[in-house]
Amino acid sequence: MISQISRRSFCVAAGVSATLVALGGAGALTAQGAMLRPPGGQDERAFVAGCTHCGRCVSACHARAIGAASLADGLLEARTPVMRYNLGFCDFCGDCARVCPTGALRPFDVEAASAGDVDACCIGKARLSREICLAWTSSSCNLCYEECPYEAISLDGDGHPVVDEARCNGCGVCEYVCPVLSLRSYIGGTARAIAVVPVSPGEEEVGR
């Protein structure tokens, strides 16, 4: 029975893969863009090689900031952990890395990372879209500046928020509190004005 189920599962997976490739080419199997991984998983090649899609890191995140990638993110990436800053933000507690059974999420210095040391851990960098940012287009919203726990966002002479990427560790607080998506949803808005994007190992050194 087990072998029958295994063969059936293999056939189903093969069929899905073939269909996706036929519909979207080889790109349907892989991510359509860089993935924002939990802390300790920024080396994408090493992470993908080690991740077993077990979901333990998702369950361990007390802030609910870790979710599972979907098929839309690529067949090979489906069910791998990604940061979902619409649900919460990262405080670098290290629980996700501690429960990872394979080391795909590498351990990091929790105390240093929690204090804002980007050398200890850097998930990504916050990027601001000025064209939809309330502070840059109409009102005096400064929530991202007020809530950033690492002083990685400052205000320019006109009161507009500006991200200091050298200080940003990608915690996601700014993205979590940004009200733009809610306010623009009635006109078809699909994104917040500030969002954390992944960086490759070493890329965070740029701008220091």
Q: Which stretches of residues belong to each language-model region?
A:
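Non-ligating segments of multi-cofactor redox enzymes
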Residues: 1-208
